[in-house]
Amino acid sequence: GLVGSEMCIRDSIETIAERLRFYKAENIVVDPVMVATSGSDLIASDAVRTLCWELFPLSALITPNRHEAEVLAEMAIHSRDDMVRAAQTIAGRYGCNVLLKGGHSDTDADDLLALRDGQLLWFPGQRVDNPNTHGTGCTLSSAIAANLAKGFGLADSIARAKAYLTDALNAQLDLGQGSGPLDHTLGGTGVENWMHGVPDAVQDK
């Protein structure tokens, strides 16, 4: 998630990384939060370098959106082939597993997992017509981390988290003005009902 202000962000990242190493923390999921949906930079370039080289190698997974992946891979992403090249570039460069989120596509919401060993997995998704999408990336990464902590494997954790996020969007919570938050209670139905379709959520390349 987003860490601190521009003045202290590099020190904050270094401190977080040091503590993670000290405690030998596991199941670390890093949502880079480098570039806003609008395309605006959220942190300075020197902080990006610190994030990449200090936190990414410690993580079980990083979850960049398309804009962030373009910065990390130093290339434009316009197609599924571009997603593959970008995800593989990031995974190879920083030695981490990469879930490149496809939610910014105009046609679908397919996500791509590129593993350190070169394996690729697609997670198909459908776009949900809901203007209230504030916090989608944070919700996905947090749900993945929670599933990893519960003992699920990486692919299963992503599939479960993606199913949960889709249902949270479909709950159509509408609060206040602008891009509002998701309904993490799934319309009051409870999370026990959000596993439908998960066994079919993972596809090999």
Model-found features: residue ranges?
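Charged C-terminal helix
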Residues: 155-205
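Short, charged, surface-exposed loops that flank catalytic or proteolytic processing sites
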Residues: 76-83, 149-159
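Short Gly/Thr/Asp-enriched flexible loops that form oxyanion-binding sites at enzyme active sites
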Residues: 12-25, 110-111
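A short helix->loop->beta-strand "cap" motif at the edges of active sites that frequently abuts
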Residues: 23-28, 94-96
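Conserved phosphate/ATP/ADP-binding segment of small-molecule kinases
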Residues: 45-120
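Short, small-residue alpha-helix embedded
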Residues: 70-71, 130-154
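Short pre-catalytic strand/loop immediately N-terminal to key active-site residues, enriched for Gly-Thr
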Residues: 120-134
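Short, small-residue-biased leader/transition segments that mark boundaries at the very start
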Residues: 2-9
